[in-house]
Amino acid sequence: MSYMIAVPDMLSSAAGDLASIGSSINASTRAAAAATTRLLPAAADEVSAHIAALFSGHGEGYQAIARQMAAFHDQFTLALTSSAGAYASAEATNVEQQVLGLINAPTQALLGRPLIGNGADGTAANPNGGAGGLLYGNGGNGFSQTTAGLTGGTGGSAGLIGNGGNGGAGGAGANGGAGGNGGWLYGSGGNGGAGGAGPAGAIGAPGVAGGAGGAGGTAGLFGNGGAGGAGGAGGAGGRGGDGGSAGWLSGNGGDAGTGGGGGNAGNGGNGGSAGWLSGNGGTGGGGGTAGAGGQGGNGNSGIDPGNGGQGADTGNAGNGGHGGSAAKLFGDGGAGGAGGMGSTGGTGGGGGFGGGTGGNGGNGHAGGAGGSGGTAGLLGSGGSGGTGGDGGNGGLGAGSGAKGNGGNGGDGGKGGDAQLIGNGGNGGNGGKGGTGLMPGINGTGGAGGSRGQISGNPGTPGQ
């Protein structure tokens, strides 16, 4: 077996020597070009002219070969220089890892946690992300499950400085993992993982509920809260995860996750609160869209024909989450999330041949209510209220069957209040009522938030 030892300094020195040799050869080649490629005939006869042309041709041929060799020499020198840099970088990395190993060894042995470095990402065997270094490092991300029913891994928390890891997505029908917390001094919380969608149900049976989204991680002294994960769709939609709280001194609250759609849709999560000194509240998550009603069954045909079945009513739409509160001194409240939309009721089933009556359409349910806007700090404006969702439309009747009733529109959310100086948040508009045999009523607009005690304008009420 043969061995090779590569010393980066020697490779760099050899590359420099090659470059110097190449420069000398190129200079000599250029100096000889005029004397070897443009020879004058020794006399005025034809023989002298042919001899001069022959030697000039040899000189030009040498110059062509010299140019090719110079290009090859440059490429070889460049490759050698790059190799020297690669070896030097690899050795520096090895030295860095060795130094970090020496630094981290005491805390790893005593506390099971390094002093500097990022936490490991979660795996199927160990789904939770590892914690970051005590002094510096980000938390590892939680594992996103591929097996139904298993909760996503939790993101690892940072130490003194660093961001929390993101939570992993849940498996089918399971909750998402929570985001890890940011560093005690500086760093943002990790985002929550999405909830898993619920598997479809068997014929005549509801589907499995979707998982809730994971909550966003909390920041330490300075930093933003993590966003909440979205709820999974399913027989009942999962709730959106709440946004994480911001750093104690400064930072914005995390935005909340959206509720999952489904038979009964999930509510949106609440936005995270800001810190003490400055920062805005997080936005509330939107409510999920209600599931549509199923079609009624057809009646049997024959001597005694059956009537068609009534279409199924829709599920309930999810409500929007509330906006997060601003920091105590400076900041605006977060906006409330919009209410989920209602869906259309199921179509009535057809009557059996021979005189069966068609079924009535299913009723649409009300749209979700908008979330309230967050309260402002001493200096800042309140958050806007969320818009109410539109009510679902009634399903069509089959034959002589009646159309279903429309659902009412969801109410708009209230605007957030200002404190000392600032404007109140505007109220959210109410949703429109759905169409049907008896149309739904439009939702009521949310009230505007109060103005600041010293100056500011009150929020405009929703329509």
From Swiss-Prot:
Annotated segments matching region Disordered: 231-320, 408-463
One Pfam entry name: PGRS
Domain PE span(s) in chain numbering: 1-93
InterPro entries documented for this protein: PE-PGRS_N (IPR000084), PGRS_rpt (IPR048996)
Transmembrane segments: none
Bias (Gly residues) ranges: 408-451
Family: Belongs to the mycobacterial PE family. PGRS subfamily.
Protein name: Uncharacterized PE-PGRS family protein PE_PGRS20
Organism: Mycobacterium tuberculosis (strain ATCC 25618 / H37Rv)
Gene transcribed to yield this protein: PE_PGRS20
